[in-house]
A protein has these predicted regions:
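Helix-enriched interaction subdomains in cytosolic or periplasmic regions
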Residues: 17-39
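Soluble catalytic domains of membrane acyltransferases
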Residues: 27-31, 44-216, 232-233, 240, ...
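Short, structured interface segments
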Residues: 214-229
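Short, surface-exposed beta-strand/loop "edge" segments at domain boundaries and coil↔beta transitions
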Residues: 277, 334-336, 356-361, 388-402
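Long, charge-rich boundary regions
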Residues: 277-358
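Acidic, Ser/Thr- and proline-rich intrinsically disordered linker/docking segments
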Residues: 367-425
Length: 425
């Protein structure tokens, strides 16, 4: 999927009219039927089936909040299939509306800016369940998983559930990550996909439980490991390109500690600094081909990278300073490509400069618990996004090296450290 990008100056981008808020629309049965039909070929190709648990507790016309884990674009097609004919609105990243706002609103999408404070979103969700009498589909992770495990959830999810005061449904997919992991560059694998849809919290549960209890129930449901699931269930991924781009996730060598020297190609992951070579097996495990393996499980390697980043932050050694190509989004008409600059990140937060000295944006670590980061964003390139309600800045690292995963890890760990320091007083 591509996106409309227009070259212009930074001043021209700022002069764009701001986005005007519009209330969500209830998707028509015709649109829902068309979307379901359009989703059928991909689902048939994956031999898709869905197990439903406890759904009899929720009436067919009763609005509910549907939470779903986020592995790949197939997730939306799965939701369309398993929820039909229940009408629902979909919380969607605002850049997904660029160049096609009418269509996105017609199918029931609600725009929001990822990892930005957005009180309007809650009001829109309330409007859906109370006025439109529709359910709301929300991907609380707000981004695709890098390593096949759950990404951080917002602590505000429990408050949102209490405000909506409707039942909560969970859709958990199996095999979707194995079919199309984000790091693999949109290359589809042959993998069967299934889902489990269950009533996570009934109306009485929502009414009787406090925010902390609701959070615990939801957070518990979002504990998963797709690589472990693949191994334990004997799911074979035999494609010869299955390790392509794995260096985007496993960017640091655990043997020589070099960063940005890993290369994922074919079925192998090789460190171009020390020569250590791993093979990503058909069952998703790692096998070292020239020595003892430091890790045999992709998420374990990624967790180690997170620990390394945290240690750098605690010691004051962490710093990112890279040249970037900069795009902006002010409204949903287009993405504005405004020039080049530098993105700096350290314990004080993000600092983006560029466009001949005209752009100077600073974002504190406490601004968000995570970071909007993506691989091959709309087929343009790997991307880091910062910004606020006025504008979003999409930064595309230049000059090689895999920095996207590390920067997201650093943003998440820095947020935790700042919160802990504040709690200590």
């Amino acid at each position: 999927m591509k996106i409309k990008v227009v070259d212009m100056t930074y001043e021209q981008a700022l002069a764009q009219p701001p986005q005007v808020h519009k209330k969500p629309k209830k998707p028509s049965l015709l649109f829902r039927t068309v979307l379901r039909a359009a989703s059928a070929p991909d689902l048939l190709a994956t031999h898709f089936h869905c197990e439903k648990i406890g759904m009899a507790q929720i009436k067919s016309d009763e609005p509910c909040l549907v939470l779903m884990n986020h592995s790949c674009f197939l997730d939306l097609k799965i939701a369309e299939a398993v929820l039909y004919p229940r009408p629902f609105n979909i919380v969607c990243t605002s850049d997904g509306f660029v160049g096609k706002e009418w269509l996105m609103r017609s199918v029931g999408c609600i725009p929001t800016r990822k990892f930005c404070s957005d009180t309007t979103l809650v009001r829109d969700m309330l409007y859906c369940v109370r006025t439109l009498k529709t359910s709301v589909l929300l991907y609380p992770e707000a981004s695709y998983s890098f390593d096949g495990t759950a990404t951080p959830l917002p602590e505000s999810i429990g408050k949102c559930v209490k405000a909506l005061n409707v039942p909560v449904v969970m859709i958990r997919t199996y095999g979707a990550f194995a079919r199309d992991p984000l790091y693999n560059g949109l290359q589809k694998r042959r993998a069967k996909v299934s889902a489990q849809m269950q009533c996570l919290l009934s109306s009485s549960d929502v009414a009787e439980r406090n925010v902390a209890e609701i959070n615990e129930r939801i957070f518990s449901a979002f504990r998963f490991d797709n690589f472990r699931w693949q191994e334990e269930n004997g799911v074979s991924v035999s494609e010869p390109f299955r390790a392509d781009g794995l260096n985007r996730v496993l960017y640091k060598c655990p043997h020589c500690l070099a960063e940005g020297k890993m290369e994922g190609k074919g079925t192998s992951l090789i460190c171009r600094s020390c020569g250590k070579e791993y093979r990503l097996t058909e069952l998703g495990t790692l096998k070292c081909l020239n020595g003892e393996a430091a890790f045999t499980h992709v998420p374990d390697w990624y967790t180690w990278e997170r620990q390394c980043v945290r240690e750098e932050l605690e010691s004051g050694a962490y710093q990112l300073d890279i040249p970037v190509q900069i795009c902006m989004m002010v409204n949903m008409r287009e993405i504005c490509r405004v020039g080049e600059g530098r993105l700096h990140h350290d314990e004080n937060g993000f600092h983006l400069t560029g466009c001949g000295g005209k752009l100077d944006y600073f974002q504190k670590p406490e601004a968000s618990y995570s970071l909007y980061a993506d691989y091959f964003w709309y087929e343009i390139g790997d991307m880091l996004c910062i910004g606020d309600h006025k504008a979003l800045y999409y930064c595309f690292p230049q000059g090689g090296g895999d920095v996207v995963a590390k920067t997201r890890l650093a943003a998440e760990e820095l947020y935790k450290l700042k919160r802990a320091a504040k709690a200590r007083g």
